[in-house]
Each structure stands twice: as C-alpha cells, then as structure tokens.
C-alpha cells in the first residue's frame, strides 16, 4: 500500500454519472494504427490497450475513431466502430482495459475536408475550403441530408460503444475536424443557417452532441475542443469558450486542446513540437474552469505527475491528459508515486511516435523500445546463464544496450573513447529549444552510470583489447563523426565545425553561412538566428529535401522558426571552395555564386565510424552486433535505441 501523500489531488477519484475513475489522469487520444486495414480489432491492438491500462491512468482514449469508416477516416488501420459486427472487438478492448485497471473511451470523429476522397466520393465539409491553402481537392459542402446522415452516424457509433460495455466516449470537436470545421470561420464560409454568426456555426455541432446525449443518456461524454486554432481567421478563445458553455448542456467533461490539424503551423499545436513550452493549454483550461460547471480536462506538453498535481491543486483543471509522457515511460506513474520521479524517462518531443501515422505504420517510440510490449526483461536470462558483454561506444545506442543488458542480468563493460557519455547527442542538445532532448540525455547518462555496468571512459577500443577482455558478445555502437570533405579552403580560420559553433567554443561574427540543409544545419541556423545573426543556409540538395526525414509536425515548426528568424535558404548549390570573400558554389545550370560571411559553419552530415565493426565482424563468426550510426549514414536516435535494444535481448 502506498499512502496518497505526494499527489493527493491527482489520486482523488472522480465520479460522473455513477462512473468512478480511480484518479484524475487520462491517457490522451492517440492514433496507433494497430487494427486490421478494415478496422477490426487485432491481438496487437488488445495488447496495446492492456499496455496503456497498465500505466495506471484512470481511463484511456482510443484516438480519432471515424464514424463513417470508409468516408470519414484519415488513416488506414484506424478502429472501426461503424457496424454492429464491430461490437465484439470493442467489448474485448473495453474488458481488456478494465482487467488491467482502467476504463476505456473512444474518440468519435469525422475528418470532414481531411477525409479520404475521390471524384465520385467527395469529402463532406461545411464549405469547399482546401487543406493548407493547397488545391481544392474533392469536397462537397454539406446539405441538410448530409448533416442528418453524419449526425446519425455519431449516434449509431455511440450506441455501439455503449453496447460493448464502454462507460465513456469522446466527441471530437477540436483540431478542425468536421464538427470544428463548422465552428471555425476559417473553414465555414456558409451563408445559410449554419454559417456566419457563432450561433449559426454552433448549430450543427450542438445538434450532434444533443442527439448523442439523447441516445446514450447514461454514458459519460467528453467533448474535445480547440481553445484556439492558431490559424488565420480561425476560431479564437472567446468563441470557443462560448461554444463550451453551450456544449456542457449535453456533455460531462470539456477537454481543452488547441490547433488545427489541416493548417500548417496550426497543426504544430495539435501534437506540440519540441519548440513549444510546457503546459501549453493550461491557461486556456483555467479560463474554461471559470465559466463551466462540468469538469475540465487539459492536454498539451504536460510531462509529469508533479505538474499534474500543481494544475489540479490550483483549480486550473480537473483531469490532466498525457500521452507522449507515458509512451516514453510506461512506468511514469508507478515510479513517481514511489518517490522515484527522477528515474522517469523524459519524452524528447521528437514526434517519431506521431510521424508513424504519416507513413501508415503503427505507433512506436524513439527512446522506448518497450512501447506496447508486455515483456519482463528480468525473466529473459535464467540464473547462471549470464553473459559478459562488451559494449563499445557510449552514445545513445551504447547506453541503451548497457541498460537493457544489465536489466536482463548480464555483466556489462562499456567503453567510450571520450571523457563523457552521450556521443553526438551532446552537441544536439545545446540550443535553448532542445530542452526536452537535453533532459533525456541527462537522464540517459544518469541511468547508464547507475545501472551497474563497468564504465571505461577515455578508452579507445582496438581488436587487441577485445581479444584481451574476451567477452561472450560485443555490441559495437561506435557512432559517427562529422564529415570534413577535401574542399579547397576548408582549413581557413573562418570555417567552423557545427560542434564548435553550437557549443559556443568559437566566435562567428554577425553574418554566418551554414553549409548543410540537414536537421543539424537548420537547427544550428535557428539557434544563430535567435542570437540575432544574419544566417544563410546552403546545400547541394533541393530546398524540398532540406531536413528530409524529419517528422512532419516538427518539420513544419522548424520551417516556421527559420522564417521567423529571417534565415535565408539556398538549395541546389554545390560548394566548390571557401575563401575570405565567402563560400563559393555552382548551381545546376553552371552559374557560380558567392555567399559572404564572417564564419562558415560545416554541417555536411556524418560518416559511420565502422572500421572496428568491420574488423570484428570479419574476425568472429558470431556474437558481434553492430547498432546505430556506425551501421550507415542517415540514422536517427530511434535507430540507435531500437537496434541496441533488440541486439541486447538476443544475447541469452
């Protein structure tokens, strides 16, 4: 038994319509894409629901569940609740959640103008307003018959949820999905009874909420709202609050979010990026609390139980909603209530989890390979069968390997050639806007130092040392080093490494040319722009390939920051030389250019440090595992962590 002393407000039960939630924590709606292409419940989906419930939340919400599976969905493999045959799978999910300690909700949604559409099957929307200012696409402005049809679909899906044993559902009125499209002046250009004034724009969404309430009078209904859309001419706080005041007649919880999934910069608030501050929507929730009678839930860059306790105790919200924090560490609640909050793995806000949806793949995490897995590492190795494993490299991959191996019970010797752990992540976390990644790095180093591995710093590993140590297995995680190509003038004093610049080890003057349009170069450019420098970024690749591979919402945010700080981007420029006058380039047409500056920053990518790996792979028939950047170029933090974890659990 654990006394409720650390977080007394968080663990105060909440009863609504006879349904008691054991605490004030909700696992936020997330799109996990673990159902079949037809939306049928799979064993993988059931396992994921069990994993979510075991986090310790009061209830979890399955995100973005379309009310018209073929026409209103945004992704393949979303949960299908649109036919009675789906009730069986829903019931299994709800039962699985309850058996593992949580209630389960489903977020009923219609993507409106963002739905999958074809010429013969256009997307339904209040008006024919295109997405992100792009081409119109196939959109049909809804008539009364369309509205009646969609309203009935919300009702029918809610009834199926009730028949499946769910006690709570969510209606998605946020992020410029269909109901929010009616609310927003940016997407509702109608001139009839459903457009123009706020009263008219509320008419259809309120009619849906009213119909659902009448159909399921005993269910708890949560309504998700964007406090503001962060979109030109979009919904603002005051009108949103007025809608919430009207909506509370039909719903039991108002859930405060923010943003517009269908407008570039507005989308960066729906799934907040690493540039966003903490507790993004708490001030909005506090305003809602002043005007609403029903409980208020709040989501958005909330990362800990301590924050949740402070929010609830201050009366700013009744329920605190998180998702990424639990994805990063499913034991966040359990560690925190036992007084070990410092051991909670912090989310980096890299959005590798959300980006999976854009590629049609299921949910995953860059720093937590255990996401969704019911796996006890301590049981994988039988007593007496422990191995001695040599881990070479103290970057993210090496640290993940060491921690995983130690949890399995193996003896671990970790070797790092420099005087500190972290590898190139030390450079990647310097900028002020990299706080979340910096906290993760600090956590990773602490956990590695405390895991019981033998740590050998300032030790370069050779094949002879491996032979001398004579381990049972070796994990090579030697990482990569910055590219320093043989370009004329590259040794000039004006030419700086991105590492030296980011760590402020060298002056750069007021005008800077960053050579490299990858993520590292562009983040360096933003950092310099924040410091008031005039920055130009050049690369041989075309502009559309700048920061290629970066998760979508963070990419949008990064482009916004580059524009905000006046960074000039020049693609298609091959560097031919450096001189005192500038960086000399030639474009695809053969035209020469010169970009002057006080400093030229090299951010031309990295190359694998794989010489040792190749030697060991050729010398030993087995027992050598190669992970992370030393495998190939173009790797991410996620690659290092995932590969190191899976290499470690293969050693038994």
Protein language model regions, located:
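Hydrophobic, well-ordered secondary-structure elements that form the walls
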Residues: 254, 288, 311, 323, ...
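Rossmann-like dinucleotide/flavin-binding elements
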Residues: 383-416, 457-470, 477-494, 499-549, ...
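Rossmann-like dinucleotide-binding cores of NAD(P)H-dependent redox enzymes
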Residues: 414-450, 527-573, 631-634
């Amino acid at each position: 038994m654990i006394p409720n002393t650390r977080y007394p407000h968080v663990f105060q039960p909440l009863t609504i319509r006879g349904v008691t939630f054991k605490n004030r924590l909700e696992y936020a709606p997330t799109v996990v894409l673990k159902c079949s292409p037809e939306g049928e419940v799979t064993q993988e989906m059931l396992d994921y629901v069990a994993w979510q419930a075991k986090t310790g939340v009061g209830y979890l919400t399955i995100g973005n569940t379309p009310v018209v599976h073929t026409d209103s969905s945004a992704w393949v493999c979303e949960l299908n609740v649109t036919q009675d045959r789906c009730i069986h799978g829903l019931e299994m999910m709800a039962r699985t959640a309850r058996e593992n300690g949580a209630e389960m909700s489903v977020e009923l949604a219609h993507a409106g103008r963002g739905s999958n559409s074809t010429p013969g099957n256009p997307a339904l929307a209040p008006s024919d307003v295109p997405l992100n200012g792009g081409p119109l696409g196939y959109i049909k402005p809804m008539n009364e018959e369309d509205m009646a049809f969609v309203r009935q679909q919300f009702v029918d899906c809610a009834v199926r949820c009730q028949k499946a044993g769910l006690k709570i559902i969510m209606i998605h009125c946020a992020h410029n999905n269909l109901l929010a499209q009616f609310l927003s002046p940016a997407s509702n250009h109608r001139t009839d009874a459903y457009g123009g004034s706020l009263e008219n724009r509320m008419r259809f969404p309120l009619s849906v909420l009213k119909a659902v309430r009448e159909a399921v009078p005993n269910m708890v209904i949560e309504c998700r709202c964007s406090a503001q859309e962060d979109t030109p001419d979009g919904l603002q706080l005051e009108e949103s609050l007025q809608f919430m005041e009207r909506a509370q007649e039909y719903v039991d919880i108002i859930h405060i979010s923010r943003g517009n999934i269908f407008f570039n910069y507005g989308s960066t608030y729906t799934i907040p990026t690493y540039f966003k501050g903490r507790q993004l929507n708490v001030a909005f929730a506090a305003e809602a609390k002043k005007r609403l009678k029903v409980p208020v839930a709040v989501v958005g860059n909330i990362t800990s139980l301590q924050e949740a306790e402070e929010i609830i105790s201050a009366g700013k919200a009744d329920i605190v909603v998180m998702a990424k924090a639990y994805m990063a560490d499913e034991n966040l609640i359990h560690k925190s209530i036992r007084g070990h909050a410092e051991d909670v793995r912090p989310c980096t806000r890299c959005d590798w989890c959300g980006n999976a949806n854009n590629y049609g793949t299921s949910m995953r995490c860059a720093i937590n390979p255990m996401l969704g897995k019911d796996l006890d590492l301590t049981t994988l190795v039988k007593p007496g069968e422990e191995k001695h494993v040599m881990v070479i490299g103290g970057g993210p991959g090496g640290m993940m390997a060491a921690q995983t191996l130690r949890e399995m019970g193996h003896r671990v010797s970790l070797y790092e050639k420099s005087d500190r752990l972290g590898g190139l992540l030390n450079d990647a976390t310097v900028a002020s806007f990299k706080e979340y990644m910096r906290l993760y790095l600090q956590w990773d180093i602490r956990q590695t130092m405390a895991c019981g591995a033998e740590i050998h710093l300032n030790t370069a590993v050779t094949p002879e040392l491996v032979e001398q140590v004579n381990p049972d297995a070796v994990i090579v995680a030697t990482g990569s080093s910055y590219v320093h190509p043989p370009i004329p003038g590259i040794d000039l004093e004006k030419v700086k490494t991105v590492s030296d610049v980011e760590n402020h080890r060298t002056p750069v003057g007021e005008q800077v040319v960053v050579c490299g349009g990858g993520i590292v170069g562009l983040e360096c450019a933003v950092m310099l722009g924040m410091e008031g420098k005039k920055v130009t970024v050049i690369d041989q690749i075309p502009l559309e390939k700048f920061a290629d591979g970066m998760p979508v919402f963070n990419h949008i945010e990064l482009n916004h920051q580059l524009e905000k700080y006046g960074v000039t981007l020049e693609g298609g420029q091959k560097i031919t030389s450096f001189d005192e006058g500038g960086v000399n380039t030639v474009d695809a047409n053969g035209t020469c250019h010169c970009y002057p500056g006080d400093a030229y920053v090299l951010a031309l990518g990295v190359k694998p440090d794989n010489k040792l790996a190749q030697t060991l792979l050729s010398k030993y028939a087995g027992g050598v595992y190669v992970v992370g950047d030393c495998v190939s170029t173009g790797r991410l933090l996620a690659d290092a962590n995932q590969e190191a974890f899976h290499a470690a659990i293969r050693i038994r």
